[in-house]
Amino acid sequence: MILWFCLNFLIVLCLEHFPGTLAAERNVPQSEEKTEQFLRDLSEISRLQRVPTGFTPFRGKFHSQSLRGLSETKKFKAPYNIHWHCKPGLLCKNFN
């Protein structure tokens, strides 16, 4: 097991030091340039699509639409009043 680990470590170490292999693929300025280009493209795409304010992709609708009926639901009350009497550490019981 130790021999296998050492062999893999040496192979990776050798590959990193030869030109045109893993060391060349890890060119930091090039990867930073790609990241900056990706961010520029992303801002351009979002500018072209113009997503309206208040839109959330998680709900798939506008916040104003989902919160529109919130004040109306506060007006509704149960036709009867339920009184819950709870004691610490015990289950609650319903007394009408």
Curated annotation (Swiss-Prot):
One of its GO terms (cellular component) is extracellular region. InterPro entries: Bradykinin (IPR009608). The keyword Secreted applies. The keyword Secreted applies. GO terms for biological process: defense response; vasodilation. It is found in: Secreted. Its main location: secreted. Keywords: Amphibian defense peptide, Cleavage on pair of basic residues, G-protein coupled receptor impairing toxin, Secreted, Signal, Toxin, Vasoactive, Vasodilator. GO terms for molecular function: hormone activity; toxin activity. Expressed by the skin glands. Residues 1-23 form the signal peptide. Belongs to the bradykinin-related peptide family. [Val1,Thr3,Thr6]bradykinin: produces in vitro relaxation of rat arterial smooth muscle and constriction of intestinal smooth muscle. May target bradykinin receptors (BDKRB). This is Kininogen-2. It comes from Bombina variegata. The lineage of its organism: Eukaryota, Metazoa, Chordata, Craniata, Vertebrata.
